Amino acid sequence: MEMTQFSTPEQKLTSLGLILPHLPAPGGNYVSAKRVGDLVYLAGAVSTGPAGVIAGTAGAGSTIDDGYAAARACVLTQLAVLKRELGSLDRVAEVLSVNGYVNAAPGFGDSPAVINGASDLLIEVFGEAGRHVRTAVGVCALPRNALVEIQMTVRVRQS
């Protein structure tokens, strides 16, 4: 992890003025995280904020900037899941992959710019350990009309 004046991911989040959200129970018959060896697979997290789901359609009422912010909100949820699962974000050795889905109008081709919100935040929090492979696709609908959904896989340090 890149060394800065902020020695932990939690300190970096605080310095950015970001707070991990409260986690509701999964919305179906699944778990939010599944650990296999040193890997943690995270279920998709839709964009939510203090007022609930961040809904919308990119290219039809929602802008790239709206989507970028929604993708960041998804990552905050995923970090909250990881903290609950691992006890501390210090246990994250590296982010391996991010799959980003954007609720997009037909012809909207800027899904990568939207998902940059997720990628940028992960690198801000974890430094080079946050750099990952990625998929960014536009889809015709997401659960609860969410603007963005993010699924991630991370590698963890053994305790």
Region locations from a protein language model:
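Short, polar/acidic, helix-capping and beta-turn segments at strand->helix junctions
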Residues: 2-159
